[in-house]
Amino acid sequence: MRACRREAVPYTPIWLMRQAGRYMQEYREVRARMSFLELCKTPSLAAEVTVTAAERLGVDAAIIFADILLIIEPMGLQLEFSKGEGPVIHNPVRSATDVDRLREVDDEAALSFVLDAIRETRRALRRDLPLIGFAGAPFTLASYIVEGGASKNYVHTKTLMYNDGGAWHAMMSLVARGLVRYLNAQIEAGAQAVQLFDSWVGALSPDDYKQYVLPHTREVIRGVKEGTPVIHFGTGTSALLELMREAGGDVIGLDWRLRLELLH
């Protein structure tokens, strides 16, 4: 937490973005009994794998076991994690009419399992070990919503973005509002810092980011409860770092493509 606040620290703190996973026998045993989504929606087990991973690795923070796409189900999207394919959205958004059908995420009860997992994790963790909550950033969530899953070229996303800016911004605004509520609910439940994952934003040019993404990401970050550190992370973002800083965040996450000694 001191590092997030840019205070002096005795060493560089370390945590991993996906701490709980297949390397853990306990995780494999749980997954043998249930799907990934079922695990995410079972607070006691999500808390257990969160705590076990943090203790096993000896890291300086825990990150709650969840997924960035959990928030899209309350929007009215049909989410499935298919073996070998990853996430699939069966009713993707491709038009203004589809955008109009999306629902506001205005009731935290729809994601209560995440909040319960945070509460259980916070009770079980060492008091000196911070707990990080997280969510997907607006563009990355929008790209999943429009593409219907992962993509290599984001053709559907960019088609909507370029051809119907009104629908695009309406969707991004709706997503951003839901994210503010969701992240603040995580903080109220016990998360001491939050991270925005913009995993796919590196697919955009700086001009596109500035026009179509930056205002919405900034809305989310500014809406997070004051005093809670926000980690703003993206991949393939060497051309976007200044704009990401403009969008906000106490910490800007870097990927493996960047040499730290060249940044300041």
Regions found by a protein language model. Give the residues of each.
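Short, flexible, mixed-charge acidic loops at enzyme active sites
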Residues: 77-92, 144-157
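Short glycine/proline- and acidic residue-enriched helix-loop micro-motifs
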Residues: 32-35, 96-106, 161-170
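Short, flexible active-site-proximal loops enriched in glycine and acidic residues
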Residues: 61, 89-90, 130-132
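N-terminal basic, low-complexity leaders that serve as flexible interaction/assembly modules and, when applicable
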Residues: 1-83, 214, 218-219
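A gly/proline- and charged-residue-enriched helix-loop-helix capping module
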Residues: 84-124
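A short acidic, glycine/proline-enriched capping/turn motif at secondary-structure boundaries
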Residues: 68-71, 86-87, 97, 138-140
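Active-site loop segments of alpha/beta catalytic cores
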Residues: 110-264
